[in-house]
Regions:
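Bacterial N-terminal signal peptides that target proteins for export
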Residues: 1-6
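C-terminal motif of bacterial Sec signal peptides marking the signal peptidase cleavage site
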Residues: 15-17
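Bacterial signal peptide processing site
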Residues: 19-21
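Functionally critical loop-and-helix segments that line ligand-binding/catalytic clefts
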Residues: 29-45, 49-52, 178-239
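Substrate-binding cleft of extracellular glycoside hydrolase catalytic domains
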Residues: 31-44, 62-142, 149
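Hydrophobic faces of well-ordered beta-strands that scaffold small-molecule active sites
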Residues: 35-39, 59-62, 89-92, 128-130, ...
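Long, well-ordered alpha-helical scaffolding segments within enzyme catalytic domains
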Residues: 113, 142-164
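Aromatic-lined carbohydrate-recognition surfaces of secreted/lumenal glycan-active proteins
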Residues: 160-179
Length: 239
């Protein structure tokens, strides 16, 4: 009987022993993941890829473009060089994105078709993102045409892959544009422009933010960027 009573008392004694106010649970401090650092540039990054990697950067943003652009589009060879070095590639479509009157449903559709064609030619894997640029300080009056443009983008990406989009959609632009397009469910990723005077600069829902002074590279024509979480970048398969 005594042993039975002792057995019943043991859990209580254990609880009393652990109730010492000086014995506080140890909380392990988990270090948040470091943000990725990268650059975007309008020219072939393959020629400076080693330098970019050696500078401690994580990703390079490069452009898909129309054939008549004076700037070179991202190529398959360039993507291979970057991927082989362990650099992620961020793809962005840019055409006449600085013009207010450019944004229509039809242009969004055909831009997406062209971007998807180039992405497949490069070998960009499905499930990664293509960002589409809105490169001016859009007002409230501009939001409806921009909305229609991104609805066209969604339809164009779907049409390019048998009715089901192969690539996710990102939006590049002011905080106001990023917020509006994401709220409408028309983009999964947002890339906040470095133009500090544009509307919505305090937008906090970005995946990439342009203009952070992390990259100090010895060549011109590039912008520094930081990224967090999943930002839609990719490497070619097998690299």
């Amino acid at each position: 009987m005594k042993s039975k009573h002792l057995a019943l008392l043991l859990p209580l004694l254990f609880l009393v022993g652990c109730s010492d106010p000086e014995q506080r649970p140890v909380v392990q401090q988990v270090k948040p993941p470091a943000r990725a650092q990268g650059v975007d540039l309008p020219t072939d990054a393959g020629r400076v890829a080693q330098y970019i990697k050696g500078s401690g950067l994580d990703f390079v943003a490069r452009y898909y473009r129309k054939p008549d652009s004076r700037w070179p589009a991202l190529s398959a060879n360039e993507a291979r060089v970057l991927s082989a070095l362990g650099l992620n590639v961020v793809a962005v479509w840019e055409s006449h994105s600085h013009k207010r009157d450019y944004f229509t449903y039809g242009r969004g559709y055909w831009d997406a078709v062209a971007a998807a064609r180039q992405a497949k030619g490069v070998g960009q894997p499905g499930g990664s993102a293509i960002y589409f640029a809105v490169d001016f300080d859009a007002t409230v009056a501009d939001m409806y045409p921009i909305d229609q443009y991104f609805r066209g983008v969604t339809a164009g990406l779907a049409a390019s892959n048998g009715g089901s989009p192969e690539y996710k959609v990102g939006v590049y632009g002011s905080g106001a544009v990023c917020d509006a397009v994401k709220r409408a469910g028309l983009a999964q990723y947002a890339w906040l422009s470095n133009s500090t005077g544009w509307a919505g600069r305090s937008f906090a829902g970005w995946n990439i933010r342009q203009g952070r002074p992390y990259a100090h590279l010895g060549f011109i024509n590039h912008d520094s960027n930081e990224a967090r979480d999943d930002y839609g970048g990719f490497r070619l398969a097998g690299m």
